[in-house]
């Protein structure tokens, strides 16, 4: 069977320059190129001396490739055929086969393998196909724009990696600052992890950049080829048009996928700190907040001490609440004077053997009038004790959620609030050397909050014990 006219020339043409091979080399993946074209398009080799194959992105070493002598001899033989003539019949290529998208001679068209195909005179085919160039050029330009945007995104992600690691190191330094000497080993470990992530992310992103830049070079090269082909004479245009179109569609179909960046670093959060607390007890806990009760917010039955750190429910009949909406009129509660709006905070409340209480935070704009529905949607995040033994979390439900009953109810409650992490955690702080987690709300607070203290009704003296704020100086009264 004879070879179809033009097919041999197509097979012996470099996919990068679209010319007959010049010093052809065959990569390890099987694709062949002019040696100079491969070196030019592949760019600088990686550390291991390899470059990506422009056709399939497989790794190859261009300097180690020897000239493909078999291809070179075929090219040399084909070069003897006059330009624009049939390789089989040596007649002028004057007819265009639409079915096979190639130029053929009159013999191929009437008697050869293209007999019965859809055929056009070369001049008519030239005029018709040339009108398709603007659309193909537009596709190429659009592909260039998309990949240029991808390059910009990757470069921005490289900056984000640096910024993420910088913020992470700052958080590590802030959390471990007070105990830096003791925790040097931990900080070193975290720093190495950050360096590893930055290194791996950087290598991955630079690899993607290299691949995209190589792909962009192919697109730009094709754009130049299109411009050159557009100005070629009829015969040469038709000979190269199919090669250009085929190569263009192949390049567009081999667009590298967008990079996905997944930075995984330990989160400096409540969980992270609790693991450290188990070894360091309270060493890394934020300093105790110097909170004081706000008498103007207290229910009329509550008595706040002069120091502002003690509050109890009086058994004497209290006057009705005033019209000040900042004051609780039904719930026997009080808030702190201090408004919390950012950062992290830790405070402790001595509850002693008080059988009923509730503690937590209250949204600054939450209502304090009437019977309160203590759930997060109403701006209340509370943990309480009922009947001297049942711990309850006031979650979003009709009834509070009963927690695991401790062997002994906590005598002191620690509350940790982190706005950045969206965490409010309650601890049993009865043991001065350890913190035992009781419950956590995991949600970002919608705005500033006040520490809230529901003293609860005195219950005819059964629940008259006070709540005491534990201060940095350990004075509670």
From Swiss-Prot:
The entry sums up its family as follows: Belongs to the TRIM/RBCC family.
Q: Which residues form the B30.2/SPRY domain?
A: 271-475
Question: Which PANTHER family does the entry link to?
Answer: E3 UBIQUITIN-PROTEIN LIGASE TRIM
Superkingdom of origin: Eukaryota
Q: How is it modified after translation?
A: Disulfide bond formation at Cys-242 occurs in case of membrane damage that cause the entry of the oxidized milieu of the extracellular space, resulting in homooligomerization. S-nitrosylation at Cys-144 stabilizes TRIM72 and protects against oxidation-induced protein degradation and cell death.
List GO terms (cellular component aspect): cytoplasm; cytoplasmic vesicle membrane; sarcolemma
Q: Which organism is it from?
A: Rattus norvegicus
Zn-finger (RING-type) intervals are 14-57
Q: Return the protein name.
A: Tripartite motif-containing protein 72
């Amino acid at each position: 069977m004879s070879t179809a006219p033009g097919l041999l020339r197509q097979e012996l043409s470099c996919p990068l320059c679209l010319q007959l091979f010049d010093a052809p080399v065959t990569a390890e993946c099987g694709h062949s190129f002019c040696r100079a074209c491969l070196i030019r398009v592949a760019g600088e080799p990686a550390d291991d001396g390899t470059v990506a194959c422009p056709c399939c992105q497989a790794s190859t070493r261009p300097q180690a490739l020897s000239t493909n002598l078999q291809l070179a001899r075929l090219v040399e033989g084909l070069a003897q055929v006059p330009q624009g003539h049939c390789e089989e019949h040596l007649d002028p290529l004057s007819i265009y086969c639409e079915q096979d998208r190639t130029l053929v001679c009159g013999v191929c068209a009437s008697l050869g393998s293209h007999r019965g195909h859809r055929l056009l005179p070369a001049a008519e085919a030239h005029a018709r196909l040339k009108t398709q160039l603007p659309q193909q050029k537009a596709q190429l330009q659009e592909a260039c724009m998309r990949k240029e945007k991808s390059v910009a995104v990757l470069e921005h992600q490289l900056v984000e990696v640096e910024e993420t690691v910088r913020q992470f190191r700052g958080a590590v330094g802030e959390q471990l600052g007070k105990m830096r000497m003791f925790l040097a080993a931990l900080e070193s470990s975290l720093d190495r992890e950050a360096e590893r992530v930055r290194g791996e992310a950087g290598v991955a992103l630079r690899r993607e950049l290299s691949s995209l830049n190589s792909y962009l070079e192919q697109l730009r090269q094709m754009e130049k080829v299109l411009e050159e082909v557009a100005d070629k004479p009829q015969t040469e245009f038709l000979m190269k048009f199919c090669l250009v179109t085929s190569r263009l569609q192949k390049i567009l179909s081999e667009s590298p996928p967008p990079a996905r960046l997944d930075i995984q670093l330990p989160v400096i959060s409540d969980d992270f700190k609790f693991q450290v607390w188990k070894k360091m007890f309270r060493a890394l806990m934020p300093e105790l907040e110097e909170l004081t009760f706000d008498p103007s917010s207290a229910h009329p039955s509550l008595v706040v001490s002069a120091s502002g750190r003690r509050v109890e429910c009086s058994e004497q009949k209290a006057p009705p609440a005033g019209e000040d909406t900042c004051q609780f009129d039904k719930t026997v509660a009080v808030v702190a004077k201090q408004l919390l709006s950012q950062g992290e905070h830790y405070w402790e409340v001595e509850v002693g053997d008080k059988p009923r209480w509730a503690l937590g935070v209250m949204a600054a704009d939450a209502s304090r009038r009437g019977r309160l529905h203590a759930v997060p949607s109403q701006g209340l995040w509370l943990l309480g004790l009922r009947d001297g033994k049942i711990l309850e979390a006031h979650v979003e439900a009709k009834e509070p959620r009963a927690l695991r009953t401790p062997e002994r109810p906590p005598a002191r409650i620690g509350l940790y609030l982190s706005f950045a992490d969206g965490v409010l955690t309650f601890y049993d702080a009865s043991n001065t050397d350890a913190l035992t987690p009781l419950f956590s709300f995991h949600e970002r607070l919608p705005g500033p909050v006040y520490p809230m203290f529901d003293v609860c009704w005195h219950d005819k003296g059964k629940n008259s014990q006070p709540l005491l704020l534990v201060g940095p100086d350990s004075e509670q009264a």
